[in-house]
């Protein structure tokens, strides 16, 4: 698990609200999304060496929308096996805070063209993940990718500015007073081949009947390969189907194997975010 994933679940020490405020704002006027479901800012981790389906079940460290809705990962118990899916928590921030975030993004250089900030210095981490910061402003989507941003101490002024921006975003959770569990209207369900090599104790494996009507072997559509993971397939589950099986999905763990006839797969799921429609 990379450092930004740890930050996302609240492992960064809490700091005073004043320290979390977005100061030194860029005075240049910038338009931003204001409607529900319109993404304003997102921070997520991609890449890195992870067990099968860990990348698929992960959710962004934070997603902030134009109406002030903020979604963050719910805390996952530090036990093995862990849940097969990742839950979310929700809270809201006011329009003034959103404006400050947009201005602070400008100070950090996040309103410009897409760019990649590579690692520098002797502490290079070959298999670290990359932090992806997406900011939507002036009707455009601006993406900054910083390799290994939280795997080593940020050394350059730019990397320090990016790390500080991310930390202040994540700290919004520590000052929120209206945090609730988020019930998604749709989830992405992933399946992949089962490999006992990824289970430290085969006795921890539990097998359950495949709960869906669609055949397990041809579930959904193939997920584009990333060169590291096993072959993965995914389909969106929503509506009555999700209402029927939501509780069943929450009982599955990372060592649950779903079975249909001679087919066996591991399963992972994650909530679809308000700006997402597909896996």
Regions from the language model: what does each represent?
Residues 56-58, 85, 127:
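Residues that act as N-cap/strand-start positions at coil-to-secondary-structure junctions
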Residues 73-113:
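A short-motif feature that recognizes glycine-rich, charge-decorated loops
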Residues 54-75:
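Short, flexible N-terminal segments of the mature chain
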Residues 66-67, 94-98, 135-141:
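A short, structured loop/turn motif at beta-sheet edges
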Residues 1-9:
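Bacterial N-terminal signal peptides that target proteins for export
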Residues 21-50, 54, 111-279:
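Short, well-ordered, aromatic-rich surface patches in folded extracellular/luminal domains
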Residues 60-62, 89-91, 140-145:
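Short beta-strand segments
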Residues 16-19:
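C-terminal motif of bacterial Sec signal peptides marking the signal peptidase cleavage site
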């Amino acid at each position: 698990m990379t450092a930004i994933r740890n930050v996302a679940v609240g492992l960064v020490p809490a700091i005073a609200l004043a320290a979390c405020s977005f100061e030194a704002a860029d005075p240049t006027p910038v338009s931003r999304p204001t409607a529900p479901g319109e993404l304003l800012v997102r921070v997520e981790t991609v890449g890195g060496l992870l067990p099968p389906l860990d990348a698929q079940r992960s959710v962004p460290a934070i997603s902030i929308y134009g109406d002030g809705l903020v979604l963050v990962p719910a805390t996952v118990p530090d036990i093995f096996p862990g849940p097969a899916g990742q839950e979310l928590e929700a809270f809201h921030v006011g329009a003034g805070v959103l404006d400050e975030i947009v201005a602070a993004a400008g100070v950090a250089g996040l309103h410009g063209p897409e760019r990649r900030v590579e690692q520098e210095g002797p502490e290079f981490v070959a298999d670290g993940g990359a932090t992806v910061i997406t900011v939507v402003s002036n009707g455009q989507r601006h993406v900054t990718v910083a390799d290994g941003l939280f795997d080593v101490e940020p050394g350059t002024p730019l990397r320090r500015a990016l790390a500080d921006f991310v930390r202040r975003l994540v700290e919004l959770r520590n000052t929120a007073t209206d945090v609730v569990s988020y019930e998604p209207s749709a989830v992405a369900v992933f399946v992949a081949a089962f490999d006992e090599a990824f289970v430290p104790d085969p006795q921890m494996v539990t097998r359950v009947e495949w709960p869906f009507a669609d055949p397990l072997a041809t579930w959904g559509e193939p997920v584009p390969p990333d060169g590291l993971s096993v072959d993965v397939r995914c389909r969106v589950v929503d509506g009555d189907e999700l209402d029927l099986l939501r509780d069943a999905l929450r009982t599955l763990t990372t060592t649950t194997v779903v079975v249909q006839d001679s087919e066996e797969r591991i399963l992972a799921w994650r909530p679809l975010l308000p700006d997402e429609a597909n896996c």
